[in-house]
Design a protein with these regions (language model features):
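Hydrophobic anchor at the beta1->P-loop junction of P-loop NTPases
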Residues: 4
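Small-molecule kinase domains that catalyze NTP-dependent phosphoryl transfer to phosphate-bearing small molecules
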Residues: 115-158, 166-169
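P-loop (Walker A) phosphate-binding loop of NTP-binding proteins
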Residues: 7
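Conserved substrate/cofactor phosphate-moiety recognition/catalytic segment
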Residues: 10-66
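Walker A (P-loop) ATP-phosphate-binding motif of ABC ATPase nucleotide-binding domains
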Residues: 1
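Conserved phosphate-donor/acceptor-positioning beta-strand/loop module used by diverse small-molecule
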Residues: 91-113, 146
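Glycine-rich phosphate-binding loop used to anchor ATP phosphates in small-molecule kinases
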Residues: 48-97
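Conserved nucleotide-binding/hydrolysis micro-motifs of P-loop NTPases
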Residues: 33-35, 78, 103-108, 151-152
Length: 169
C-alpha cells in the first residue's frame, strides 16, 4: 500500500499516476472520483468525507487481499489517525505500507490549486489549502519526504526505490 500525504496541490495525483504506470496491477484509489460516484452533487461535509474514506479503506482491503498494490490518492492524510487507519488495513492483509510525504511550500500548493480549473473537487481553493496546512500532522513511524518542486522523474525514481525496499523487491 502506498499512502500519499500532502496538501491539495502538492502533486499527489501526478505522483500516483506515475507510480501506477511503474507498478503492474496497482490500483489507484482516488478520493475525488469515489466521492463523485457516491455523492453527486457533493456537499463536502465531514460526514460525506467519512463515508468516502471508509469506502476507500474497504476497497483497499479488497485489493490487498488479492495481492494488488493500492495507491491512495486525493486524500491529504493530514491526521495521524487517517494514516494509522490505512496502515491497519495493510497490516491486516499482510501488505507493506509506504508512506510518502509530498512536501511543497504553501505558496506553491495555493498557486497550483488556483491554476487548476478542471479539478474534480469543486471545493479546492486557497482557503482549503491553508486550512489543511494548519491541521497537518507529521506522520508517526517511517516515511519518505519528497520535494514535490523537484524533477518529476527523479521523484518517481525516489518513490519507487522506497516502495521496492519496503516491498522486499
Amino acid at each position: 500500500m502506498i499512502v500519499l500525504v500532502g496538501l491539495p496541490g502538492a502533486g499527489k495525483s501526478t505522483l500516483a499516476e506515475a507510480l501506477a504506470r511503474r507498478l503492474p496491477g496497482a490500483r489507484v484509489l482516488d478520493k475525488d472520483k469515489v466521492r463523485h460516484v457516491l455523492f453527486d452533487p457533493c456537499d463536502y461535509t465531514s460526514a460525506e468525507r467519512d463515508v468516502v474514506f471508509a469506502a476507500m479503506l474497504d476497497a483497499a482491503r479488497y485489493h490487498l487481499g488479492r495481492d494488488r498494490i493500492v495507491v491512495f490518492d486525493g486524500l491529504t492524510f493530514s491526521r495521524r489517525s487517517q494514516v494509522a487507519a490505512a496502515e491497519a488495513v495493510a497490516h491486516d492483509a499482510g501488505a507493506f505500507v509506504a508512506v510518502l510525504v509530498c512536501d511543497v511550500p504553501l505558496e506553491v500548493a495555493i498557486a497550483r490549486v488556483e491554476a487548476a480549473d478542471d479539478h474534480l473537487a469543486a471545493n479546492r481553493d486557497a482557503q482549503v489549502v491553508r486550512r489543511v496546512a494548519a491541521e497537518m500532522e507529521e506522520p508517526s513511524g517511517d516515511y519518505l519526504t519528497l520535494d514535490m518542486t523537484s524533477d518529476p522523474e527523479r521523484l518517481v525514481d525516489q518513490a519507487m526505490a522506497y516502495v521496492e525496499e519496503l516491498a522486499g523487491e
